[in-house]
């Protein structure tokens, strides 16, 4: 049963951009130059669930994830996390809450510093948030390396990201996200750059870590196969709006919105 109190609640969340125009374009054009990447989204995410956010590239999924984390400040609406409105927090208060909200990005190579060893990269969030003395960080990092399947841990600790495969890099990124013991993990296309066989291994790892660490996932993907395999509920996003929301099997077997139907028709093997 779903608990009554959501871990994350979005209320009329907006992320709008204005395109810069030159003087003459402004003078002779009455067109609205606002891009509504996230346009009035209401969404609730409950403890222990995996909510999939699906849609085509460019529909606003990644912008939504960055707005939830306040990597981008919302232009309107509210983000409530643990019943606290993040839009009202000061920068230090927000930094404190970020320990509880972590992100796994699409490209692990881009988010890992090539000059830092694997061990130092994973330890970095521990030290930033002052969760343990530097002398204790190495033991915590090696424990996390073991949890994500990078063994022997002492060897991987001293390697650099460029010495690892894509799947191993993503395991490091997962370890880095989980080292602060967050409650919410936002996964932005975390397996889309991996080979199919490695995808399945990383998804299985993420599922077991979810149970072990009592995690809640917001799982962003354009891959409907992955969403159906991994998610409890599905939110379908199109042009900055959530157009359909429901339990995974219900959305796949009985889609209500024309956009959802079109998405599924483009991947016919998924239906039924």
Spans of model-derived segments:
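ABC ATPase "signature
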Residues: 245-246
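Conserved ABC transporter NBD signature motif
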Residues: 77-85
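ABC ATPase NBD coupling module
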Residues: 28-30, 86-102, 120, 128, ...
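Conserved ABC ATPase signature
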Residues: 159-164, 168
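Helix-to-loop junction immediately C-terminal to a conserved catalytic motif
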Residues: 69
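Conserved catalytic motifs of ABC-family nucleotide-binding domains
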Residues: 181
């Amino acid at each position: 049963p779903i608990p009554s109190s959501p871990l994350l609640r979005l209320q009329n969340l907006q992320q709008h951009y204005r395109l810069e125009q030159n003087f003459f374009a402004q003078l002779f054009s009455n067109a609205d130059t606002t891009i509504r990447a996230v346009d009035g989204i209401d969404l609730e995410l409950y403890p222990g669930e995996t909510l999939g956010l699906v849609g085509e590239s460019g529909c606003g999924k990644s912008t939504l994830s960055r707005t939830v984390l306040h990597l981008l400040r919302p232009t309107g609406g509210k983000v409530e996390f643990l019943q606290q409105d993040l839009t009202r927090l000061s920068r230090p208060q927000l930094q404190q809450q970020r320990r509880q909200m972590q992100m796994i990005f699409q490209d692990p190579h881009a988010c890992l510093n090539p000059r830092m060893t694997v061990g130092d990269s994973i330890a970095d969030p521990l030290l930033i948030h002052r969760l343990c003395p530097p002398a204790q960080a190495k033991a915590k990092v090696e424990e996390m390396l073991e949890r994500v399947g990078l063994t022997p841990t002492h060897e991987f600790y001293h390697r650099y990201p460029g010495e690892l495969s894509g799947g191993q890099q993503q395991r490091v990124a997962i370890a880095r996200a989980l080292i602060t013991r967050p409650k919410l993990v936002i996964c932005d296309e975390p397996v889309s750059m991996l080979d199919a066989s490695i995808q399945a291994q990383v998804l299985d790892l993420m599922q077991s870590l979810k149970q072990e660490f009592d995690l809640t996932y917001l799982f962003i993907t354009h891959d409907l196969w992955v969403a159906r395999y991994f998610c409890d509920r599905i939110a379908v996003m199109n042009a900055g709006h959530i157009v359909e929301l429901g339990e995974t099997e219900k959305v796949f077997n009985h889609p209500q919105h024309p956009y959802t139907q079109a998405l599924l028709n483009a991947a016919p093997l998924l239906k039924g």
